[in-house]
Amino acid sequence: MKKSYSGGTRTSSGRLRRLGDSSGPALKRSFEVEEVETPNSTPPRRVQTPLLRATVASSTQKFQDLGVKNSEPSARHVDSLSQRSPKASLRRVELSGPKAAEPVSRRTELSIDISSKQVENAGAIGPSRFGLKRAEVLGHKTPEPAPRRTEITIVKPQESAHRRMEPPASKVPEVPTAPATDAAPKRVEIQMPKPAEAPTAPSPAQTLENSEPAPVSQLQSRLEPKPQPPVAEATPRSQEATEAAPSCVGDMADTPRDAGLKQAPASRNEKAPVDFGYVGIDSILEQMRRKAMKQGFEFNIMVVGQSGLGKSTLINTLFKSKISRKSVQPTSEERIPKTIEIKSITHDIEEKGVRMKLTVIDTPGFGDHINNENCWQPIMKFINDQYEKYLQEEVNINRKKRIPDTRVHCCLYFIPATGHSLRPLDIEFMKRLSKVVNIVPVIAKADTLTLEERVHFKQRITADLLSNGIDVYPQKEFDEDSEDRLVNEKFREMIPFAVVGSDHEYQVNGKRILGRKTKWGTIEVENTTHCEFAYLRDLLIRTHMQNIKDITSSIHFEAYRVKRLNEGSSAMANGMEEKEPEAPEM
């Protein structure tokens, strides 16, 4: 059943009155309303706010929470409807409620004549302002929607998903509604008066008259309560509430209304996250470094060889200082002593805040005599005496806080560059002393040999060391892991080191170097193609200094300590056996 009302508008009492204007043509607007007859449905009722009834105007009404159930084209049609004039676009708008389940339905067509008035210029073609006197239409959705129609679903405010999460507004009083017992939707109308103090904010009825959607969004944001953190609901109450969209204007759907709900409150005093798994074990290295820099280091080096092999010069070149005995205590005439004299001199060297107490031990007269029998004994006695001194400091009841370390850490043995092989004196000395000290053999004045002679000479010395069982530093048995083994193998291949010493500086290609200048060129001491002094310096100072000290303390000194304690215990046992037991006194 279809009813048509043409040329009239429904008033507040339910009657239709005809609108006419002689000044302009009448525009006809049609609304198709589908009425569904349900046996349990209740007639729609109008609830007016009693607090606002006195100031209600006949032309100010608002449909609250109109959900656009269609997709983007429907929203664009509504947006264009609010922005265009009646002459430019007159389309058919269908207002419908939730779809009923009964197949039998009635369609009521309500036609409203809208009088058009020209503003400011009657002859100009432009947008015209028009007003709806009464636009109260409640309908239902047709079974088959047209593709060009805009469907507006009217639901209860309590069924909206957004309204269920929002508290009641503070500015607009809450509309008292009775609980719904059936599935039929109820229409709730709130009539809002136009505020006198804010003329720029239009009423809900004026949103259909104004072509600009900005006041609609401002009024919508005023009427809506302030967003608060949402309370999640497990199940929606109705299908229409889950599919509801913002109503009236398309830009309201594009603007996020509850942006404040998505943004979490930022903490002002937020601190950086703390790694609770960090313990701080790596700080022990810094602690050891500070302690070592306060205490300093000690390094004792001995040089052994015949006179004139450049022992003092090489020591000065190693540390780039005048630290040798001859440099510190020069003598006008120095004769070869009849017996080997052990002379040592100590220097305090500081570099980049690191202090080191360096002791250089010289052995003048070694191998300079005709009869060199047992010439190694004074040197071995000196080394053992330093071990004994350190041992006595350890066994004392009241030990010192820090025992002075005078033990010989390394012994540089100078081999003359004969080009043949090791002498019997060299073999005997290194065989005996390799068990009590770290021996590093070097070829003195290697610049007197050609490159081919140097290679053959080194091969012969290596063969002699292996045949006589002489173990020089770095020893294979003291390699801790594969990494140390790889590094030490490179040094073992270079033994004995062919070195050249010089304490004179020269300018070569704008660079200062240590070397020896001859008629045919300059020998650079630190150039690895000229000699192997740089490798010797790395072994003694830059890479293996601490390892040399550790082997001296844990291997050589421990062997001497065990031997001395065994001798002391055996001597004490022999003394106790010789004594007769005495009778105890009363």
Swiss-Prot record:
Record-listed Phosphothreonine modification sites: T38, T42, T49, T142
Annotated region described as Disordered, given as residue ranges: 1-49, 62-108, 134-268
Any Gene Ontology CC annotation: cell division site
Biased amino acid composition, Basic and acidic residues: 134-151
Location(s), subcellular: Cytoplasm, Cytoskeleton
An example Gene Ontology molecular-function term: cadherin binding
Sequence positions bearing Phosphotyrosine: Y278
Listed Low complexity bias regions: 1-14
Residue ranges of every copy of the Septin-type G domain listed in the record: 295-567
N-acetylmethionine: residues carrying this PTM: M1
Positions of region (G1 motif): 305-312
Entry-linked Pfam families: Septin
Entry keyword annotation includes Cell cycle: yes
Superkingdom, natural source: Eukaryota
Binding site for GTP: 305-312, 339, 365, 445-453, 501, 516
Region (G4 motif) location: 444-447
The keyword Cell division belongs to this UniProt entry's keyword annotation: yes
Residues the record lists as N6-acetyllysine modifications: K62
Entry's Gene Ontology BP terms: actin cytoskeleton organization; cytoskeleton-dependent cytokinesis; positive regulation of non-motile cilium assembly; protein localization; septin cytoskeleton organization
Disease involvement: A chromosomal aberration involving SEPTIN9/MSF is found in therapy-related acute myeloid leukemia (t-AML). Translocation t(11;17)(q23;q25) with KMT2A/MLL1.
Function (record text): Filament-forming cytoskeletal GTPase. May play a role in cytokinesis (Potential). May play a role in the internalization of 2 intracellular microbial pathogens, Listeria monocytogenes and Shigella flexneri.
Subunit structure comment from the entry: Septins polymerize into heterooligomeric protein complexes that form filaments, and associate with cellular membranes, actin filaments, and microtubules. GTPase activity is required for filament formation. Interacts with SEPTIN2, SEPTIN6, SEPTIN7, SEPTIN11 and SEPTIN14. Interacts with RTKN and ARHGEF18.
Family: Belongs to the TRAFAC class TrmE-Era-EngA-EngB-Septin-like GTPase superfamily. Septin GTPase family.
Protein name (Swiss-Prot/TrEMBL): Septin-9
Native source species: Homo sapiens
Underlying gene: SEPTIN9
